[in-house]
A protein has these predicted regions:
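Catalytic Walker B motif of ABC-type/P-loop ATPase nucleotide-binding domains
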Residues: 161-165
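Conserved ABC ATPase signature
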Residues: 136-140, 144
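Helix-to-loop junction immediately C-terminal to a conserved catalytic motif
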Residues: 49
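ABC ATPase nucleotide-binding domains
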Residues: 236-261
Length: 261
């Protein structure tokens, strides 16, 4: 069983955003969602996280309609990091990570304190943020701040981790750092990762499965080497590109010019 989408249609202000999507997200794999700006990538991610429930069709988790699963139960299985997150003023890294334990608490019960501490500590260690626990989030660099947000998501102990352009605004080193953390979580914990990426080469290197969205529908889905090629770049993004193999034996796409109409 897995996270699946059947005939998904989303409209906003009577405008088609997604139309007739059918998708299966392989359990324990890394799926990258790519496509041009405005294609509906972030909308799809919000639907998968039940942040947007105004749609036609069915989104199911292990065969159960997502809209019938309680928000608390869903948050224990699925965590999402949208774009543009803003931390409360003066909050520390440790306190932010502790927010990830909210799905395990209720208004009349604080939860299992020992389990919460262990989950938060593990999340900080997994992201290399254990020595930053008492630092204010707003005082961190961009890369450190993104790792702090990932730690919060990991404290939920989810089976599914959804990320919307997790490397946006980061320099090359911090992009690599974040992508390696995500891949390690997938490899060591068999965590299912679904991420919207704008960097095609990140998708080539760090995804097991690619979903390409164009004109509000699925242009292609498959393994990176099957769907990421110069023909796709021309048709979906309108650019000509070269493809070569780098020193690590990985394929790299290098855009060189716009496609001439």
């Amino acid at each position: 069983m897995a996270l699946e989408v059947s005939n998904l249609c989303v409209k906003i202000a009577h405008k088609d955003i997604l139309r007739g999507l059918n998708l299966h997200f392989p359990t324990g794999k890394r799926t990258a969602i790519i496509g041009p700006n405005g294609a509906g990538k972030s909308t799809l991610l919000r639907v998968l996280a039940a942040l947007n429930t105004k749609y036609e069709g069915v989104v199911s988790l292990d065969g159960e309609d997502l809209r019938k699963i309680s928000r608390k139960k869903l948050a224990q299985r699925l965590a999402i990091l949208p774009q543009g997150l803003s931390a409360p003023p003066d909050i520390t890294v440790g306190a932010l990570a502790d927010y990830g334990r909210f799905p395990y608490r209720s208004w009349h019960h604080s939860g299992n304190a020992k389990a919460d501490r262990e989950a938060v500590e593990m999340a900080l260690v997994q992201t290399g943020m254990q020595d930053f626990r008492d630092r204010q989030v707003m005082a961190l660099s961009g890369g450190e701040r993104q790792r702090a947000w990932i730690a919060m998501a990991l404290a939920q102990q989810p089976e599914y981790l959804l990320l919307d352009e997790p490397t946006t605004y980061l320099d090359i080193a911090h992009q690599l750092e974040v992508m390696q953390i995500i891949s390690r979580l997938n490899r060591e914990q068999q965590m299912t990762v679904i991420m919207v990426l704008h960097d095609i080469n990140h998708a080539l290197q760090y995804a097991d499965e690619i979903v390409i969205i164009k004109d509000h529908g699925i242009f292609a889905q498959g393994q990176p080497e099957e769907v990421l090629n110069v023909d796709m770049l021309a048709k979906v993004f309108g650019v000509r590109a070269d493809i070569f193999v780098n020193s690590q034996g990985a394929s790299v796409l290098s855009p060189v010019a716009l496609v001439q109409e």
